[in-house]
Design a protein with these regions (language model features):
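General marker for long, soluble alpha-helical cores
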Residues: 1-76
Length: 76
């Protein structure tokens, strides 16, 4: 699914679960911003695949509407 469609859904107030693997961090940031504007929630699976600066930008854009899932992080 194209991220522009996900952005439109978030703008309409649709909460969603997305997989960070294979998505650009800029797309996740845009979706998070739309979620913040509409009050929707964004749940990001495989968040350990993202760089820390990307996580910070997504979190800032989401203004408390983003949940990161690090549970699949097998690194020790």
């Amino acid at each position: 699914m194209m991220s522009i469609t996900l952005e439109n859904l978030a703008k309409l107030g649709a909460s969603m679960i997305v997989d960070a693997e294979g998505m650009m961090s800029s797309s996740l940031e845009s979706i998070a911003k739309k979620c913040a504007e509409s009050g929707a929630k964004l749940y990001v699976k495989n968040a350990h695949k993202l760089m820390s600066i990307a996580l910070e930008r997504i979190a800032k854009a989401g203004k408390g509407n983003v949940t990161f899932d690090f549970s699949n992080d097998k690194k020790k």
